[in-house]
Amino acid sequence: METVISRFLRYVSFDTQSNEESETCPSTEKQRALGKALVEEMLALGITDAHMDENGYVYGTVPGDPSKPVVGLIAHMDTAPDASGAQVKAKIVPFDGSDICLNEEKQLYLRQADYPELAQHIGKRLIVTDGTTLLGADDKAGVAEIMSAAAALLHSDKPHATLKIGFTPDEEIGRGADLFDVEKFAADYAYTVDGGLIGELEYENFNAAGAKVVCNGLSIHPGSAKDKMVNAQLIAMEFQSMLPQAQRPEHTEGYEGFIHLTGMEGSVEHASLHYIIRDHDMEKFQQKKQLMTAAAAFLNEKYGAGTVELTLKDSYFNMLEKIQPVMYIVERAKNAMEHEGITPIVVPIRGGTDGARLSFMGLPCPNLCTGGANFHGRYEYIPVEDMERITKMLVTLLCEAE
C-alpha cells in the first residue's frame, strides 16, 4: 500500500498555485491537473463515485456503517500565491537539532534559532524544500493524509463511519467554499485538515472584512497651489494616522484583532488605501469597522463631503457560533488525537478556513492539524512521523464516530 509520504511527495510535484486576479473557478487551470490525478487515484482505490465537477472540486465516498454518522474530511489543492509552487524539490532530512542546509549555493538554512518550535522535532525526519519554492504542505499534506486514511479504511474490517471526501480549489485566495456543494456532499459534519503543528485543533477563527478607502483631492500647479491644492495622498496618510497603532498585525497575537493596511497607491488627485479587518470577538470587530467609518466622517467634515469614500465588505465570520451547538464533534476529534498519543492543542485560527465558510453554509467544520509549519514560504517543513500519526488519527476518528 502506498504511504502518506509517497503520496505527499507526488502531490507537491504538481504546481497548483492559485491566482487572485483570475475570476474563473478554479482560478488556475493547473489545479485541475492535480484534481484529475486524485480522481484517478480514488477510482483505483475503489472509490467508485470519485469525480471532479465543472468548477474543479473533487468529491468521493468511502461507504461505512449506516448506523454511524456521515463524516466529511476536506482539504484544499491550491498553494498560496505568496511563493512559487513550481518544480518543488522536496527532500527528507533527519533532524538532530543542527541547522538544515536547504540551499548551499544561496546559503539558506532552516535554523532552530530562527524557529524555536523545531526543538520538538529533534529525532524526526523533516520534509523540507531546496529554498527556492514553498513546500506545499499547506494543504497537500492534508490531501495526502485524507487519501491515506481513505485507503486504510477501504482495507479495514473495522466498522467505521461513511467518509465523504472533498478537495477544494482556491482556498488560499478565499474562494475555496464558494462553489462547494454542501447538499451533494451530504455529510452530517466535517473537518478540514488544513492546520499546522501536530495536535492543533481549531474551531474559532477571525471575523473578517475588507475596506477600501478612496481619497479625492484637487490638483493644481504647485507654483499657484496656495489655499487651492488638496493632496489626496496626504489625506490618505491622515486617515491612516487616525487608526490605532497597537491594532496593527505586527503588534497582535492570540485573540487580539487587527486593522491591516495591505496596499496603497495615489496621486494628488486620487489616493486609495486597502485594508483587511480581523477580530475573533464580534463586538470588537464591529468597533473596528465603526472606527474606520468615524475617521472617514471626520475627514469629510474637515475637507468637504465626498473627500473620503469608504467601502466596507464582510468576508467571513467566526465559526464558533456554529460549532458551539455541536461541540461533540470537537470532543470526538480530541478523543481521536488522544487515542493516538497526540495531545490536543486548542488554538484560535488567526485567519480563516474553508471550514469557517462551510459552517455558515450548514456544514459544521472544525479544523484539524496537518503537522506542517512555516507555510507559504521557502522555510516550510513537515515531519514524516507526524504525517503518519495524523493519518492514523483520521482513521480512528472515522472508526470511533457514533
Place the predicted regions along the sequence by residue.
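Short glycine/serine- and small hydrophobic-enriched flexible loop segments
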Residues: 147-154, 238-245, 396-399
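Active-site-adjacent substrate-binding region
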Residues: 234-251, 258-260, 307, 317-365
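Active-site metal-coordination/substrate-binding segment of hydrolases
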Residues: 68-159, 167, 187
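Midchain, well-structured core segments that form catalytic/ion-binding scaffolds
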Residues: 100, 124-137, 170-293, 297, ...
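Zn-dependent metallopeptidase/amidohydrolase metal-coordination segment
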Residues: 267-269, 344-398
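N-terminal capping segment at the start of a domain
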Residues: 2-29, 128, 316, 376-377
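A non-catalytic alpha/beta surface segment that caps or lines the substrate-entry region
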Residues: 23-68, 72-74, 78
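Short beta-strand
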Residues: 49-54, 262-265, 347-348
